[in-house]
Amino acid sequence: MEFAYAKETDKYVANAIISSGLIATTAQDNTAAGLLGYAAQAAQLVYSNSLGFARNIVVSPEQWANIMGYNDSGRPIYNASQPQNAGGQVGPQSLRGNVAGLDLYVSRSLSALTYTTGDGSMFVINPESYTWYESPRLSLRSDITATGQVSVAYYGYGALATKVANGSVHFNKN
């Protein structure tokens, strides 16, 4: 139940951030060059609109796989130990990494929102623009003596506060 609760809250936050943020004004191809163009433009838009720096990029698992596969003449850009053209560090052993100077996070909720590798499949964010507030979670159990069953309920409340408008920019696929 804890996992189901976490999935739903993650999906809620991802959807709220995407719907309240900006879309990149220039559509980019879903390539290594497109990723760098998007990251540069998104960082500029976040700073221009929120007066804070873009520090994170959140991607769907499908985009994570794309980023790990980006290469330059067969040499991996993000997934090698000593690359000559390192653009960051992304690997299959962690859902965290670094892409173009932004901290990378992978969220399966972006796939659940039907964003896989198109618009909304990743967003660059100034984390100071949003805050997630959450109550302690409570699990209630009650025995149903007539049938021998146990009823379990899991409660928690949360809210996302947008502190600075337009603190995120999501991908605009060409």
Language-model-derived ranges and their functions:
Residues D29-V150:
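Extended oligomerization regions of viral-like shell subunits
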Residues I18, E62, Y157:
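An acidic- and aromatic-residue-enriched active-site/binding cleft used to recognize and process polar
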Residues E2, A6, S109, Y155-Y157:
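Residue-level marker of positions within ordered structural domains that often coincide
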Residues I18, L104, V152-Y154:
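Hydrophobic alpha-helical segments involved in membrane association or supramolecular assembly
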Residues M1-N49, H170-N174:
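Alpha-helical scaffold segments that mediate packing/assembly in large oligomeric complexes
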Residues D10, R137-N174:
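Protruding loop/beta-arch "assembly-hinge" segments enriched in small, turn-prone residues
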